[in-house]
């Protein structure tokens, strides 16, 4: 079933203007709802355990929850946590906006970065937010294997529950959120207004991708099973679910080199 489904934003030919507007919406939604707030303590713990202050965020989209996560981490950290945003299709305008807002904390890679083959010079805790469901089991194994080969700790986080209520919520509420909040999304784009209100391609594709995303979600034990297949007992793994303020489950898989 997974192989038969696709998400528009994964397609190489999909227009950047539409893709970036979709991920800009996701960043706004994740920030306003504090979607990933419950996993910040996990990230803080693994940073301290591995003595890292750098986060290499993979599959960043438009930045996802980076502002919320960074704020939470720096509130409890003794040092200044730094985040490098990366993506296969980097959203340069959004990354620049975030970098200008947090010049001492956020940087980005302007070239395409494959989560399965991260450059060795990008050192730190690797994170993936709302992205792992885009990959099949083989690709997830390659992502984890690459982290292990580079002795990099990794945290994978994905939100939502695989049920009909989640799908109905996406169908009913996301179009309304687009209608109400699109003028507040940054960076401002005229094209975003056109393809939201006049020709609603952005909301349509976002809702379609959201529905497919729900059907593709992985259970935490599934992710941990994939991880252990690629790990020769070199890493400590922890997986599970925590509820956020919306009452939705956030799945997590965290791995770090054994000390």
Kindly give the residue locations of the regions a language model identified.
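Hydrophobic adenine-recognition pocket in adenosine-nucleotide-binding enzymes
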Residues: 131
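A short, conserved alpha-helix within the catalytic core of class I
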Residues: 135-150
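A conserved beta-strand element that flanks and buttresses the S-adenosyl-L-methionine
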Residues: 126-128
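Conserved Class I S-adenosyl-L-methionine
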Residues: 3-7, 209-259
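C-terminal alpha-helical "lid/dimerization" subdomain adjacent to the S-adenosyl-L-methionine
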Residues: 167-227
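Conserved beta-strand signature within the Rossmann-like core of class I S-adenosyl-L-methionine
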Residues: 147-163
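Class I SAM-dependent methyltransferase SAM/SAH-binding core
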Residues: 53-120
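Class I SAM-dependent methyltransferase Rossmann-like catalytic core
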Residues: 1-57, 62-64
């Amino acid at each position: 079933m997974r192989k038969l489904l696709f998400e528009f934003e994964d397609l190489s030919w999909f227009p950047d203007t539409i893709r970036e507007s979709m991920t800009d919406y996701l960043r706004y939604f994740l920030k306003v709802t504090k979607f990933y707030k419950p996993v910040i303590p996990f990230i803080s713990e693994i940073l301290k355990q591995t003595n890292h202050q750098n986060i290499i965020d993979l599959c960043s989209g438009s930045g996802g929850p980076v502002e919320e996560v960074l704020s939470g981490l720096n509130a409890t950290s003794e040092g200044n946590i730094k985040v490098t945003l990366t993506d296969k299709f980097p959203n340069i305008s959004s990354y620049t906006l975030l970098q200008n807002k947090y010049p001492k904390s956020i940087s980005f890679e302007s070239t395409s970065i494959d989560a399965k083959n991260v450059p060795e010079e990008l050192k730190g805790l690797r994170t993936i937010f709302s992205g792992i469901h885009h990959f099949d089991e083989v690709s997830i194994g390659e992502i984890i294997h690459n982290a292990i080969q580079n002795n990099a700790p990794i945290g994978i986080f994905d939100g939502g529950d695989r049920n009909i209520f989640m799908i109905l919520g996406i169908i009913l509420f996301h179009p309304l959120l687009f209608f109400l909040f699109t003028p507040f999304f940054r960076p401002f784009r005229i094209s975003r207004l056109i393809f939201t209100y006049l020709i609603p391609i952005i909301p349509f594709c976002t809702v379609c991708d959201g529905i497919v995303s729900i059907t593709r979600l992985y259970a935490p034990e599934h992710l941990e099973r994939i991880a252990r297949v690629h790990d020769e007992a070199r890493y400590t793994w922890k997986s599970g679910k925590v509820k956020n303020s919306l009452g939705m489950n956030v799945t997590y898989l965290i791995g770090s080199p054994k000390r």
